[in-house]
Amino acid sequence: MNHLGVFETRFRPRTRHKSQRAQLIPEQITMRTAVLLPLLALLAVAQAVSFADVVMEEWHTFKLEHRKNYQDETEERFRLKIFNENKHKIAKHNQRFAEGKVSFKLAVNKYADLLHHEFRQLMNGFNYTLHKQLRAADESFKGVTFISPAHVTLPKSVDWRTKGAVTAVKDQGHCGSCWAFSSTGALEGQHFRKSGVLVSLSEQNLVDCSTKYGNNGCNGGLMDNAFRYIKDNGGIDTEKSYPYEAIDDSCHFNKGTVGATDRGFTDIPQGDEKKMAEAVATVGPVSVAIDASHESFQFYSEGVYNEPQCDAQNLDHGVLVVGFGTDESGEDYWLVKNSWGTTWGDKGFIKMLRNKENQCGIASASSYPLV
């Protein structure tokens, strides 16, 4: 036998009999299982603890950022549950946005701890049924009808913010005074166009003092009623002299601190988006009422808002159209200023679908004051 053969023989590894190996395998599996199962259990616990920590950290940040305080521990647990449910809905919608199935994103905002019906009761204060009833019963509730200007070609886009005609985004708080903010916004724009001076006007003046004109303070009102009050009253006070409180208070209008006045208002033909675009382009910001009754509006963040469930007759929220345009995908939109603060939407604004059969009723009740 050669040296190689000797080497192979001397150093050949010992082998176990087949039956011995068969006995060893179950023992090895049992030992490995005994080691792995506790490790897996620890890992699962660690992940669960980690997830719970993340959730509570998000909740803590939310409460801190939006200054949330609850009556007791029971209410806080209830609000945390709503917060987590809303977060799940938002994440689900945004996954559809990432897949290109919807044209706008949602985000957690200060309303994330509210049930949707609570949110609607608190924030949406426009009554379209009352609007129609008043106009049908009395001609004085109707304004001058808008007539298209001659020889005007509509621009591709308009943004009155860049022209200095729009005040900073305001916050109505937990008060259904959207109609007052829409009214002041339109008059602020018209006053600026006439005087060249942008003056922030008092929503609280309208909340407190225009009840005889059919408005109901924090429980809702109509922009046209506000314009009628301002005309008959000889003006509206400045925001600085009559600051916002987000409650119904006694009227303390002061003629010495009037910021602007009007001499009536103009109504744009119902449902006519083309005429409304002409008014926005040539006149300035326009008061409108919309259907804002959907959760998608509550948590809107960016993109062109396209809500197929919107109703052109179910109008419950007053806002201000400050421009229009077309986005990079070719979608026409209205540029709308809301009154829910800068943490809502796109820094307080929303792009709403334009030229799509009057979606959300944006052209159903539009008007602006005459100055």
From Swiss-Prot:
Any GO BP: proteolysis involved in protein catabolic process
Signal peptide: 1-48
Keywords linked to the UniProt accession: Developmental protein, Digestion, Disulfide bond, Glycoprotein, Hydrolase, Lysosome, Protease, Signal, Thiol protease, Zymogen
Domain of life (superkingdom): Eukaryota
One GO term describing the cellular component: fusome
Subcellular location: Lysosome
Family matches, as InterPro entries: Papain-like_cys_pep_sf, Pept_asp_AS, Pept_cys_AS, Pept_his_AS, Peptidase_C1A, Peptidase_C1A_C, Peptidase_C1A_papain-like, Prot_inhib_I29
Positions annotated as glycosylated: N127
Catalytic center residues: C178, H317, N338
Propeptide: 49-153, 327-329
Cystine crosslinks: C175-C218, C209-C251, C310-C360
Pfam families: Inhibitor_I29, Peptidase_C1
Tissue specificity of this protein: In the embryo, predominantly expressed in the midgut. Also expressed in larval alimentary organs such as salivary gland and midgut including gastric caeca.
SMART domains: Inhibitor_I29 (SM00848), Pept_C1 (SM00645)
Documented EC number(s): 3.4.22.15
Phenotype of gene-disrupted mutants: Flies exhibit wing and pigmentation defects. Females are sterile, males are partially sterile.
Function: Important for the overall degradation of proteins in lysosomes. Essential for adult male and female fertility. May play a role in digestion.
Family: Belongs to the peptidase C1 family.
Subunit structure: Dimer of a heavy and a light chain linked by disulfide bonds.
Name of protein: Cathepsin L1
